[in-house]
From Swiss-Prot:
It comes from Rhodopseudomonas palustris (strain BisB5). Its main location: cytoplasm. The gene is pyrH. This is Uridylate kinase. The keyword Nucleotide-binding applies. Its EC number is 2.7.4.22. Homohexamer. Keywords: ATP-binding, Cytoplasm, Kinase, Nucleotide-binding, Pyrimidine biosynthesis, Transferase.
Length: 238
């Protein structure tokens, strides 16, 4: 791993990835591997906050198509992100890394309430801040949450961990002619309609001048590699 080019980041992790080889739930070996990667990255001196999706447990958009209202479905999905953060937090602590789950929902028996000050305190004390509960409002994705929280806590970048190694002109799993972009501006990402993040997230990143680095989480150690400015990834900035 090279010298990190960022000092404070928000890492956005897919909830689906937490399911591992399963299609649902939490795969402990996958959680442990992600925890190890985060700890190694933290060891570089980088302050790390994490936003996790909830798609391995619940997807509000899908259930809303089956009769549940979109606000209720989205709220259920945001609660699923709390479960994922609790699982990741326990794995981090088991490996000796201080971690704190901060939720946009008030649930004092489970975790602390997210505030900007609480997140910054956790980072300043060497802990990894796990930012759960989405924005706390329906109709906003956890990608948008990651950009919002990054702007709030003064992060240098959002690291978007996916199952592909960057932003492509088309789905590389379906189109063998798809090409990977090394760099895109926020406006180009918006105009291209690339599905790696939603338009609201890209628009907010543009407004707040936040770089987004899209990379594959499949390779062990990839978080640290990206922090050093190396590896295969797409940088969305400018």
């Amino acid at each position: 791993m090279g010298e990190p080019i960022y000092r404070r980041v928000v890492v956005k992790l897919s909830g689906e990835y937490f399911a591992g080889p399963q299609s649902y739930g939490i795969d402990q070996s996958t959680i442990d591997r992600v925890a190890g990667d985060l700890i190694a990255a933290r060891g570089l001196g980088v302050e790390i906050a994490v936003v996790v999706g909830g798609g391995n447990i619940f997807r509000g958009v899908e259930v809303s198509a089956r009769g549940v209202s979109r606000p209720t479905g989205d709220t259920m999905g945001m609660l699923a992100t709390v479960m994922n953060c609790l699982a990741l937090g326990e794995a981090l602590q088991r490996h000796g890394q201080k971690a704190r789950t901060l939720s946009s929902f008030v649930m004092p028996q489970v975790c602390d309430l997210y505030t900007r000050a609480a997140a910054q305190q956790t980072l300043g004390e060497g802990g990894i801040a796990l930012l759960a509960g989405g924005t706390g409002n329906p109709f906003f994705t956890t990608d948008t949450t990651a950009v919002l929280r990054a702007a709030e806590i003064g992060a240098d970048a959002v690291l978007k961990a996916t199952n592909v190694d960057g932003v492509y002109s088309a789905d590389p799993k379906r189109d063998p002619k798809a090409t990977r972009f090394e760099r895109l501006t926020h406006s180009e990402a918006l105009a291209g309609g690339y599905k790696v993040m939603d338009a609201t997230a890209f628009a907010l990143a543009r407004e707040t001048s936040l770089p987004i680095i899209v990379f594959s989480i499949a390779e062990p150690g990839s978080i640290g590699t990206v922090l050093g400015g190396a590896g295969r990834a797409t940088v969305v900035a400018g």
